[in-house]
């Protein structure tokens, strides 16, 4: 339970602060707590250590807004496609998945991180950092609409696309305040242009997705292929216009990511050898805290697995116990929101919900609701695209009411 684990972390941190510091046991595995929390913290640490305000955020409304089409053209001039006839670029072994910088504030862009796997595809670190900064500028809403504050918001959902294995994929469009609507048009058009002139010539495709955790199946390569086919398919009628308003390429489920490429944080790497005394002190403190948090979640995982699998040879309890019952996942206090609120007086009687696999490892990375993710994948093959398009075409014939609604709206 996330609430209990967070409360337990605070309790452990307070005890650690009051007692002599001891070495952390899991120093070789310091990134095993929730991925988005880790990435957001590292991204914010980069800003803090450099003592810079985000240069492309809502915090600087007076900065000149450039035409996103011009931004895309300038970027493509700086980084033209590979010459025709050149050796084909490499392929990504895993998709690159980068979350937005701060939930709920889309114009902040995405976490400033780089996947070294992109190097084999012809995209080096400096190029990718330039892309992230430029995309953030392209998505900033125009100043002259800053006074608009429309409170009405409505959701308009295009039909979902049934994908193999029952994975649901649906494009959702939210009509919110006018400033955000205009900003969404800019970011969407910029990314489409960059896909055509930058990513696709290098064998890649970049799309921005949000996720609907109500679906029960795991996201697959086929669902990504369908999302790409959807964004590259010419639009007509209402779909042509709603496509321009959506802030992300699609909404898909469910709650688990596929395995993704490792990320590095360029500013932190640079500071490892170039930091001044104050920056080095902050960086050192943060590293210690990361190790402490990773050790805490690692001990919770070991304790939970040992409780559920007492006869397994892998079920070794953590070598170091918990200083508070609020931190111990096996204490009755932490087994449900009710037991937590009552201090364990109301018992938890239902069965354990599985959160670890049979080997006691941490579960797959969970997708956060209401968060946008930038995903870069290998461009699907023609066969993959054809299969995805046929799935969409088949579904379209089974939804006459939706299609007729689109047609009527287009006529209007």
Curated annotation (Swiss-Prot):
InterPro entries, sorted: Burnettramic_acid_biosynth (IPR053221)
Functional summary from the UniProt entry: Part of the gene cluster that mediates the biosynthesis of burnettramic acids, an unusual class of bolaamphiphilic pyrrolizidinediones that display potent antibacterial, antifungal, and cytotoxic activities. The first step of the biosynthesis of burnettramic acids is the hydroxylation of proline by the proline hydroxylase buaE to generate 4-hydroxyproline. The PKS-NRPS buaA and trans-enoyl reductase buaC construct the highly reduced polyketide chain, and the condensation (C) domain of buaA then catalyzes the amide bond formation with the activated 4-hydroxyproline.
Involved pathway(s): Mycotoxin biosynthesis
GO biological process, one term: antibiotic biosynthetic process
Protein name: Burnettramic acids biosynthesis cluster protein E
Encoding gene (name): buaE
Source species taxonomy: Eukaryota, Fungi, Dikarya, Ascomycota, Pezizomycotina
Region entry Disordered, spans: 1-66, 308-342, 386-412
Feature: compositional bias, Polar residues: 395-404
Acidic residues biased stretches: 36-58
Swiss-Prot/TrEMBL keywords: Antibiotic biosynthesis
């Amino acid at each position: 339970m996330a609430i209990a684990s967070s409360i337990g972390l605070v309790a452990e941190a307070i005890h650690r602060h009051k007692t002599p510091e001891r070495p952390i046991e899991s120093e070789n595995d310091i990134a095993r707590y929730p991925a988005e929390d880790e990435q957001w913290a590292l991204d914010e640490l980069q800003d803090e250590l450099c003592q810079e305000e985000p240069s492309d955020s809502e915090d600087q409304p007076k900065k000149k807004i450039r035409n996103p089409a011009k931004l895309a053209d300038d970027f493509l001039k700086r980084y033209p496609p590979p010459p025709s006839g050149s050796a084909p670029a490499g392929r990504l072994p895993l998709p690159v998945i980068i979350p937005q910088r701060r939930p709920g504030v889309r114009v902040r862009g995405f976490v400033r991180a780089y996947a070294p796997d992109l190097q084999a595809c012809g995209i080096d670190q400096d190029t990718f950092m330039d892309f992230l900064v430029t995309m953030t500028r392209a998505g900033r809403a125009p100043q002259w609409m800053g006074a608009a504050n429309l409170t009405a918001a409505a959701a308009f959902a295009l039909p979902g696309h049934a994908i193999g294995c029952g994975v649901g994929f649906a494009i959702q469009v939210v009509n919110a305040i006018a400033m955000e609507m205009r900003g969404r048009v800019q970011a969407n058009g910029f990314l489409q242009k960059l896909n055509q002139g930058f990513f696709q010539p290098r064998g890649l495709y970049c799309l921005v997705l949000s996720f609907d955790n109500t679906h029960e199946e795991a996201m697959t390569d086929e669902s990504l292929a369908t999302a790409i086919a959807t964004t590259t398919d010419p639009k007509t009628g209402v779909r042509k216009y709603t496509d321009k308003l959506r802030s992300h390429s699609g909404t898909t489920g469910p709650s688990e990511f596929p395995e993704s490429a490792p990320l590095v944080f360029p500013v932190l790497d640079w500071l490892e050898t170039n930091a001044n005394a104050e920056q080095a002190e902050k960086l050192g403190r943060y590293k210690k805290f990361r190790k402490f948090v990773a050790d805490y979640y690692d001990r919770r995982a070991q304790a939970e697995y040992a409780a559920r699998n007492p006869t397994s040879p892998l079920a070794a309890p953590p070598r170091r116990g918990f200083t508070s019952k609020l931190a111990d996942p096996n204490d009755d206090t932490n087994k449900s929101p009710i037991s937590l609120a009552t201090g364990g007086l109301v018992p938890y009687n239902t069965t354990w919900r599985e959160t670890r696999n049979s080997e006691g490892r941490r579960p797959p990375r969970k997708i956060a609701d209401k968060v946008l993710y930038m995903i870069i994948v290998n461009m699907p093959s023609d066969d993959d695209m054809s299969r995805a398009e046929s799935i969409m075409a088949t579904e379209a014939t089974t939804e006459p009411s939706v299609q007729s609604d689109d047609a009527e709206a287009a006529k209007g």
